[in-house]
Amino acid sequence: MASCIREVVEALIKKLQADVTPNTVLVPINDYYEIKHTPSLLVIGPKLEENRSKRNSEKRVEVDRDNLSYTERNWPRYYHLDFDFVLTADTGAALLDLQEKGIAFFLDNREITTADASFRLVELTPIGGLERPNYSNLRQASGRYRIEDVEVFDHDVVEGKIVLYRNFRLCDFGSRRLIETYRPDE
């Protein structure tokens, strides 16, 4: 099973590169980075926070009636992925233009979609505030956004057959005497 966290983060980065700026990169938390091109968008994270209200200790059973089988596993844990977004530009005017693109992105995209599911995209702290980092001539603005309820499954999976064997016994209606036993699995 592919990583759901990886899929949703890759989908977010690709969408930001297409809609905001092609100079969008993902950097891990507590990593020192160097801005190589402006304008740029640094996506710092994700920082995971579990959604404990959705925690469930029961087993999840999925039945495949066509194949007469079942799959039993624990319910997934749901995590919120928090990202810090840092916009960087050469001038204040270019930063304001980039801020507008970033804000419009989050207004236009309320969810991030992968091949299997879609996840809500929530604004925690809007992008804003002009800052001058490290006494350089670059301008920066930052904000925080969240992707909610990303599923993470454990690897404890039990698969089995619903029906272990099937025998059909054909009997004479009047005497109840066995005429034939039919085994479709053989």
Identify what each model region corresponds to.
Residues 1-63:
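Small/polar-rich, solvent-exposed N-terminal microdomains that initiate assembly or binding
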Residues 1-7, 17, 54, 70-72, ...:
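Compositionally biased, intrinsically disordered low-complexity segments enriched in polar/Pro/Gly
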Residues 18, 96-99, 103-162, 170-172:
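Acidic-leaning, charged glycine-interspersed low-complexity segments
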Residues 30-32, 70-75, 127-135:
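Catalytic micro-motifs at enzyme active sites that drive phosphoryl/nucleotidyl and oxygen chemistry
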Residues 47, 91, 147-151:
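Non-catalytic surface loops within mature trypsin-like serine protease
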Residues 37-39, 77-83, 139-141:
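Residues at beta-strand starts and edge strands
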Residues 85-95:
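A generic structural motif
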Residues 47, 57-87:
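Active-site-adjacent structural patch at catalytic or cofactor/ligand-binding sites
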